[in-house]
Regions:
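Extreme N-terminal tail/first-helix region
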Residues: 1-38
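Soluble catalytic domains of membrane acyltransferases
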Residues: 15, 32-153
């Protein structure tokens, strides 16, 4: 039977070395929802910054399944989320998983804030939703391009 997700899909430099229970939980959630993580990242990208475009972002389930995939892969993946989700215990967990809260009511600083948070992370995978929202959009926002350019990702 084909594995749904495996940490062997990414170079070791991107491994987070989180607890085995968390890896198991991520894999179990993906199994329940019949999701797979397809493909792998080549060793030639190790110790580099990569930007992964995650689209379309249309549901709150995207975040749950995304965090499950991050846990199942045991990956050090940085992602941006709406600041209101980062409250109480959930906020601490999301930060532990690589989340960066952003306040979208202050749009001028979102990209700069994200870049400042990510700049010092070597060998980072940055997962971004180019829509910037769950709402249907006709065009993607360009922040992910600015982040990739600034970080040489």
């Amino acid at each position: 039977m084909k594995k749904r997700v495996s940490k062997e899909q990414i170079p070791e430099c991107f491994w987070a070395n989180r607890p085995k229970f968390l890896q198991w939980l991520g894999k179990t959630i993906l199994t329940i929802f019949d999701w797979h993580v397809c493909g792998s990242i080549s060793e030639k990208y190790k110790n580099k910054r990569l930007v992964a475009i995650v689209a379309p972002h249309t549901s709150n389930w995207d975040g749950i399944l995304g965090v499950a995939a991050v846990a199942g892969l045991d990956a050090r993946i940085t992602f941006i989320g709406k600041h209101t989700v980062f409250r109480y215990g959930l906020g601490a967990f999301l930060r532990y998983m690589g989340g960066i809260p952003v306040d979208r009511s202050k749009p001028g600083g979102i990209i700069e804030h994200a870049i400042d948070q990510i700049r010092d992370i070597e060998g980072a995978i940055i997962a971004l939703s180019p829509e910037g929202t769950r709402s249907k959009v006709l065009e993607w926002k360009t922040g992910f391009l600015r982040i990739a350019s600034e970080l040489n990702a």
